[in-house]
């Protein structure tokens, strides 16, 4: 188990990683939700939910082959659903739906993916109520408009506007993170996603957040169904929020934190 401090000024602002643009959120949420790809300590792209990826036309079309053993779980590690290619479609629809995400993290997909800007502008013409009912399901306006294909549950294809040989680096960013439509439905619709918390969100990452006391403490608990069985994880990680580095040092001296 690990216990460490964080300044209270770096408190989490949202549990919806697709909405966040804040590094304080990312350092928490990226432990809870996994993307297609990650960068290792040397900056090299490594597999995450995508086990294979590539382009055969100079970056115009990108194909990602997904693992078939990634699960969405609840706070207590109970299985909710499989994580599939459709969750990445749902995530992208959320990002480029004007009334769902307030234009946060929209710029890269709109500039790179075919039809993304067209769909984004279309959602602007709708009322907030209409736009929030849209989904990325089969036969949806999103799937018909945007350059994303799902030949099967574990294959994801993006069509770029022009050749983007670096598009795989974008697959590490929150603009291409997944979201489960099952979670959206369980929460009661899009309006409740922005305000979701650690107790009702779904997880597919290394940890779940089993306790959250705002401005005080967060407890991350190892996800028992995490796909990467070779990853060395702490059973729990406790983050104690402190008012200053002086307070953190006092806690360290008293043995209440590890560093």
Summary of predicted features, one role per range:
Residues 41, 129-136, 141-145, 152-154, ...:
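Gly/Pro-rich hinge or "lid" segments in bacterial periplasmic/extracellular proteins
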Residues 52-115, 157, 248-253:
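Aromatic- and charge-enriched surface segment that lines or borders ligand/interaction sites
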Residues 7-57, 202-203:
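N-terminal lobe/hinge region of extracytoplasmic solute-binding protein
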Residues 37, 41, 68-71, 93-101, ...:
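Sec-exported extracytoplasmic/periplasmic mature domains
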Residues 1-11, 61-64, 88-91, 156-157, ...:
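Short, well-ordered beta-strand elements
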Residues 239-250:
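Short helix-initiation/N-cap motifs at beta->coil->alpha
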Residues 57-58, 150-152:
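Residue-level recognition of beta-strand termini and adjacent short loop/turns
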Residues 34, 68-79, 144-146, 237-238:
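Second-shell loop/turn segments in exported
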């Amino acid at each position: 188990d690990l216990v460490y401090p964080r300044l209270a000024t770096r408190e989490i602002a949202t549990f919806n990683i697709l909405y966040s643009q804040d590094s304080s959120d990312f350092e928490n949420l990226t432990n809870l939700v996994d993307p297609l790809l990650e960068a290792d300590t040397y900056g090299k792209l490594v597999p995450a939910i995508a086990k294979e990826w590539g382009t055969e036309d100079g970056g115009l079309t990108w194909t990602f082959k997904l693992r078939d053993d990634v699960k969405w779980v609840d706070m207590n590690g109970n299985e909710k659903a499989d994580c599939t290619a459709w969750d990445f479609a749902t995530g992208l629809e959320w990002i480029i739906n004007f009334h769902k995400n307030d234009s946060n993290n929209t710029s890269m997909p709109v500039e790179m993916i075919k039809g993304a800007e067209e769909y984004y502008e279309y959602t602007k013409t709708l009322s907030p109520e209409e736009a929030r009912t849209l989904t990325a399901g089969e036969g949806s306006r999103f799937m018909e408009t945007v350059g994303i294909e799902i030949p099967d549950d574990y294959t994801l294809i993006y069509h770029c506007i022009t050749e983007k040989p670096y598009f795989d680096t974008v697959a590490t960013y929150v603009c291409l993170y997944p979201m489960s439509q099952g979670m959206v439905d369980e929460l009661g619709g899009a309006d409740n996603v922005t305000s979701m918390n650690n107790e009702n969100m779904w997880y597919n990452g290394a940890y779940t957040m089993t306790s959250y006391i705002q401005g005080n403490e967060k407890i991350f608990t190892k996800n028992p169904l995490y796909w990467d069985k070779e990853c060395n994880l702490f059973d729990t990680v406790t983050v104690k929020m402190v008012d200053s580095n002086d307070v953190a040092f006092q806690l360290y001296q008293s043995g209440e934190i590890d560093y």
